[in-house]
């Protein structure tokens, strides 16, 4: 599998730790590098109150031009051809910080494979939205439970069609 996934990065944003756990497991089974997308201004519980239409995440999700700043940077993005991109589903889509990440790099010639965590929502139209933000090829992706069996995760990773 390591030959198949050569030059592969698992990049993720996690608020509660669920996506982090999934990303760590995916990086392990895929023999890929791991990168955490860290917001410049960390999110708080209050920021993520979806019941409050004035919460930070509610405002971001309702503003298609919102691009939360990122504190971390992949120093060697050119070496990666395949990028697993993990995030929680917020308001039925990827958080805006994922769009910031994609727009921060030249993704032309890269294969983007989204994966997400959610208490109830599926990945929805996230791939279509993310495709607008980069020149790479974004596939539909999948939603997982954070404690998915590593063997199932490995099988899913192998089934993706990667750039060589």
Each model region followed by its residue ranges:
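A glycine- and small-aliphatic-rich helix-loop capping segment at beta-alpha/alpha-beta transitions
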Residues: 100-106, 133-134
């Amino acid at each position: 599998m390591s030959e198949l996934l050569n030059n592969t990065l698992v990049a993720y944003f996690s608020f509660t730790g669920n996506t982090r756990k999934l990303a760590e497991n995916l990086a392990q089974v895929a023999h890929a590098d791991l990168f955490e997308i860290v917001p410049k201004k960390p999110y708080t519980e209050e920021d993520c109150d979806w019941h409050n239409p004035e919460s930070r995440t509610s405002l971001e999700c309702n503003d298609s031009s919102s691009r939360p700043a990122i504190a971390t940077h992949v120093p060697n993005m050119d070496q990666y051809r395949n990028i697993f991109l993990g995030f929680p589903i917020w308001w039925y889509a990827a958080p805006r910080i994922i769009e910031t990440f994609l727009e921060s790099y030249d993704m032309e010639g890269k294969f983007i494979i989204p994966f997400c965590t959610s208490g109830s929502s599926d990945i929805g139209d996230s791939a279509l939205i993310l495709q607008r933000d980069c020149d790479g090829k974004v596939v539909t992706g999948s939603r997982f439970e954070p404690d998915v069996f590593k063997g199932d995760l490995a099988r899913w990773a192998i089934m993706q069609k990667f750039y060589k």
